Amino acid sequence: MTDRATPNLPSRDFEITSAFYGELGFTSVYRSDDWMILRRGEVVLEFFLYADLNPATSGFSCCLRLDDLDAFYATCRDAGIRETTRGWPRLHPPATEDSGLRIGALIDPDCTLLRLIAND
């Protein structure tokens, strides 16, 4: 197995989290009472149960580095996630930043920020 790191993200409710990410093509590969692992291709997200999380004050985030940012973004839009600046879940469209990186954003139902970064 290749060395790797995976983000550990909060979930107030595994059913809601699993359904949300399932619409984006993620499948469950492990679940217990307090831990869940979802996979979409080579992208693995691990979730811990955090029932008392206040999404409005959550500072959790991670980066998804994607070979096809546009396709993943389209999947998010097709799942009904809106481009807006308020509430969650929500999307922010990809744009080229000063760094030269093309980055969008997905905010999940627990207000976790997933930066969507196009691979070179």
Protein language model regions, located:
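Short glycine-enriched loop/turn motifs at secondary-structure junctions
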Residues: M1-D3, N54-G59, E97-D98
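N-terminal beta-strand motif that seeds the catalytic metal site of vicinal oxygen chelate
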Residues: M1-E15, C62, I117-D120
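Short aromatic/hydrophobic contact patches that present stacked aromatics
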Residues: T6-N8, I37, S61-C63, I103-A105
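Conserved active-site tyrosine of GNAT-family acetyltransferases
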Residues: T17-G22, C111
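Conserved acetyl-CoA-binding loop of GNAT-fold acetyltransferases
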Residues: L24-S28, I81
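Conserved short beta-strand elements that form part of the metal-binding/catalytic scaffold
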Residues: V29-F60, L64, L113-A118
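Vicinal oxygen chelate
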Residues: L64-D110
